[in-house]
Amino acid sequence: MNYKDFQNRVDHGMQMFDAGNIQAALEIFTALVNSDISDIDKSSMCLNIAVVYDKLGNVQQSLEWYARAIQYEKPHCRFEAQEYLATYLKQIDRPREALKILDSLMASTHLSEADKVRVRENIEQLKVEINKPVYRRPGA
């Protein structure tokens, strides 16, 4: 697929999503995942699909598509999908799982120094959130 065709399809999928035509967006992004685009672009389309499923309230499907995105990017020493998954896990109140992902990223040798700083900052924020005391009213 040439780049212009790819970009037109992505744009169309985004327009469908923004217009609330979720099914059309899913079909477009899924077709792109099943096409001859690069693994990195397939990973990005999986991330788009994960966002669509989250919008539909289907957390399990969303998590499955994040996992697929990670599988496409991992052989290429990329980690964008892992960071997005960690962010999503934090949003759905699963900070410990997010922390595990970011900790595993720090152990990898393919992070740039700037990446390490960003990931460390995210780890520290998660640790603060995890260790934040929870106050409950007596008898509640």
List each model region and its residues.
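TPR/TPR-like (Sel1-like) alpha-helical repeat modules
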Residues: 90-113, 124
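Alpha-helical segment of the N-proximal tetratricopeptide repeat
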Residues: 5-35
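Residue signature of alpha-solenoid helical repeat architecture, marking inter-repeat boundaries
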Residues: 3-4, 40, 76, 114
